[in-house]
């Protein structure tokens, strides 16, 4: 780029050239020469890139951080390239400067043009501010439909911060005073001075901060721009002082740090878009256009707002946790109620068993009732027609209790005959000697013993009878045998036969030793 001052005219018809092909023609240096609106087209191209990155933000949060760093690098490259000239032209948005013949700096007309040059720069800065404001609002509108509004909004804020950096550099690059006799400063020297910005600790990439080879002017353009400097070096105006450039570097570093804080906010909160940050970004742009030294204060305010948003998110998360805990407590209460219901059921069962026990006790032992008297017409009265009185577990009539020397005749409840009171059959009523009267238990034992004795006697009798029958049978058998022997001895064949044995031989039925065919009797 040349550093000579020349008068320029505004060309409103060159806006279409800057926006074609997303700034590709601008990067190649094919725009109209001498138009200041190329700066606006460069900003438009940057905003188009921001819109593209916003669309990518909907898909990947990690790409948001990288895209933010890329935008910062492009903004740094703009700073490095735009500081070499007195105009607002940069390599990304403006092509070659027009070649004009050098004029006499001592002429009044040229001095007027050179004095009016900063005013033109201020107007261009205002235009850039308007573009940046519109772009930031467009980014907010586009980001409302995204799945993660906060991520996209932070991206638009970083884009607006990049625009504000460009504006502040434009203000600082305006010459404060005209020095006709100053030495020329080449663009290559300015680039070497501002290259350390790329190596600052802002996470910027050195390769990304350097301008693209296509955006650099050709060798022919460099020679064309350097010819006026070689012929008339005294007519060139000096570039901004190094102290001003260092101040710009400091401001840019602060802005970059704030952008990094915004990217850290992406990881902390992702709930709702914060429209207060968009307003703060617009206010930062306006302030940067007026006084670049106020960047630090405004950026600190942005950081405070971001911190407040983070705190709100944390509180909101705590509220969610409290709600969950309350739900758990409610569930526990329900469980406790269920346990109480179970306990009630158990108590009901216990009471039912108690009532059953009471019923059984009433059915089995009515003598243990606490009622001391029963009316004469009571169903449970053992003495119908008389008042019954309970004493020591035994029911008595009133007359029995009133008589002094009366032997009590208790009435016993018989379970085999339910509902009736009967006297004990075996109970002896002896008025004079009550000790002679036996208890029914003793009588029962005596009866059992007597019955056992009788059974034994009967058994003995039966045994005796059996033995007698056996003896009689034996006697009859012996008598029959004697009769048979007598009959045999009186037969006519007695001389020819031998004595017969009383027991026959099982092998042969013949008992005669002489083998006579005589069958045994």
Curated annotation (Swiss-Prot):
Keyword annotations: Lipoprotein, Myristate
Keyword Lipoprotein recorded: yes
Entry superkingdom: Eukaryota
Compositionally biased region (Low complexity): 13-23, 37-90, 114-148, 162-173, 207-262, 276-356, 433-451, 467-488, 495-514
Positions of N-myristoyl glycine lipidation: 2
Biased composition (Polar residues): 97-108, 149-161, 174-206
Keyword Glycosyltransferase: no
Region (Disordered): 1-356, 429-451, 467-521
Protein's name in the database: Putative uncharacterized protein DDB_G0285119
Species: Dictyostelium discoideum
């Amino acid at each position: 780029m040349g550093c000579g001052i020349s008068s320029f005219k505004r060309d409103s018809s060159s806006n279409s050239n800057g926006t074609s092909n997303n700034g590709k023609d601008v990067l190649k240096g094919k725009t109209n020469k001498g138009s200041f609106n190329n700066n606006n087209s460069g900003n438009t191209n940057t905003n188009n890139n921001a819109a593209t990155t916003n669309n990518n933000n909907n898909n990947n949060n990690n790409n948001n951080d990288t895209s933010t760093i890329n935008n910062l690098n492009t903004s740094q490259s703009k700073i490095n390239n735009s500081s070499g000239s007195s105009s607002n032209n940069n390599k990304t948005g403006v092509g070659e400067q027009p070649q004009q013949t050098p004029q006499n700096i001592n002429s009044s007309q040229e001095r007027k043009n050179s004095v009016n040059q900063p005013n033109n720069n201020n107007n261009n800065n205002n235009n850039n501010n308007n573009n940046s404001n519109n772009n930031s609002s467009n980014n907010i509108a586009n980001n409302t439909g995204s799945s993660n509004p906060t991520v996209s909004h932070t991206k638009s804020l970083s884009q607006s911060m990049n625009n504000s950096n460009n504006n502040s550099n434009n203000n600082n690059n305006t010459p404060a005073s005209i020095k006709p006799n100053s030495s020329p400063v080449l663009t290559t020297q300015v680039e070497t001075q501002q290259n350390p910005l790329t190596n600052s600790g802002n996470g910027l990439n050195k390769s990304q901060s350097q301008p693209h080879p296509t955006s650099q002017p050709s060798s022919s353009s460099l020679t064309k721009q350097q010819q006026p400097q070689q012929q008339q070096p005294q007519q060139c105006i000096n570039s901004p002082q190094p102290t001003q450039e260092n101040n710009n570097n400091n401001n840019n570093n602060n802005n970059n740090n704030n952008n990094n804080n915004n990217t850290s906010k992406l990881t902390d909160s992702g709930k709702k878009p914060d429209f207060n940050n968009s307003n703060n970004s617009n206010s930062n742009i306006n302030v940067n256009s007026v006084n670049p030294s106020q960047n630090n204060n405004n950026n600190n305010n942005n950081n405070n707002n971001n911190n407040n948003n983070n705190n709100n998110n944390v509180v909101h998360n705590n509220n969610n946790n409290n709600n969950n805990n309350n739900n758990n407590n409610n569930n526990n209460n329900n469980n406790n109620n269920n346990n109480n219901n179970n306990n009630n059921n158990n108590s009901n069962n216990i009471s039912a068993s108690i009532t059953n026990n009471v019923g059984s006790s009433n059915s089995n032992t009515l003598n243990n009732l606490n009622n001391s008297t029963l009316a004469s017409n009571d169903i449970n009265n053992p003495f119908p027609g008389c008042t019954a009185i309970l004493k020591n577990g035994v029911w008595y009539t009133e007359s029995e209790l009133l008589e002094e020397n009366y032997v009590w005749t208790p009435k016993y409840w018989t379970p085999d005959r339910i509902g009736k009171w009967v006297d004990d059959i075996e109970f002896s009523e002896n008025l004079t000697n009550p000790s002679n009267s036996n208890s029914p238990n003793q009588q029962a034992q005596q009866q059992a013993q007597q019955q056992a004795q009788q059974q034994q006697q009967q058994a003995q009798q039966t045994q005796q009878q059996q033995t007698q029958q056996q003896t009689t049978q034996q006697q009859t058998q012996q008598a029959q045998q004697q009769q048979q022997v007598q009959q045999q001895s009186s037969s006519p064949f007695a001389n020819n036969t031998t004595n017969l044995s009383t027991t026959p031989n099982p092998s042969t039925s013949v008992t005669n030793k002489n083998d006579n065919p005589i069958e045994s009797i």
